[in-house]
Amino acid sequence: MHFAAQTHVDNLFKNNFEFTKNNIYGTYVLLEACKVTGQIRKFIHVSTDEVYGETDEDAIVGNHEASQLLPTNLYSTTKAGAEMLIMAYCRSYGLPVITARGNNVYGPNQFLEKLILKFILLAMRGKTLPIHGDGSNVRSYLYCKDVVDTFEVILHKDEVGHVYNV
């Protein structure tokens, strides 16, 4: 399972090259290693639902796995780029790949810069909570145990080339 990535979007504005290097080139390095060894039974890439771009809040149905990718920031663009590389390796070299598109995970031992823990700590200190944009954005969150259970199911699927929304 390929979880490795730069994910904290605020850091993107400080050093966007690291996002490209880690999320695209890092994925390329892993894919090449898998191709060269020929020993990989399954390559599960962990992506993000942000590759879909902005979702209409009035939509009855959310994004489907076959929905067009319309990333809106460099983070989601690098994850979409990595997905394109992965599918190319699947088609060109027969690498057995699966992509899982998740969203924000929360739970114990979360990084301090992640939103839920960051807001809790700031609120406990009576500090201002930073809001990006006009504050109308909505995000989904998954509890870490639920994510683990989901990846356990995906790990045992034999549907190579498929994308799953988590």
Q: Where are the predicted features?
A:
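N-terminal Rossmann-like NAD(P)+-binding domain of SDR-like oxidoreductases, especially those catalyzing
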Residues: 1-105, 145
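Short alpha-helical segment that forms part of, or immediately flanks, the ligand-binding pocket
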Residues: 17, 120-121, 139
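Hydrophobic pocket-lining residues that define ligand/cofactor binding sites across diverse proteins
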Residues: 34, 90, 123, 154-155
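A generic structural signal for secondary-structure junctions
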Residues: 56-57, 120, 124
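Alpha-helix initiation/capping motif
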Residues: 67-75, 108-112, 140, 166
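Glycine/proline-rich active-site loop of Rossmann-fold NAD(P)-dependent oxidoreductases
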Residues: 80, 105-118, 125-127, 132, ...
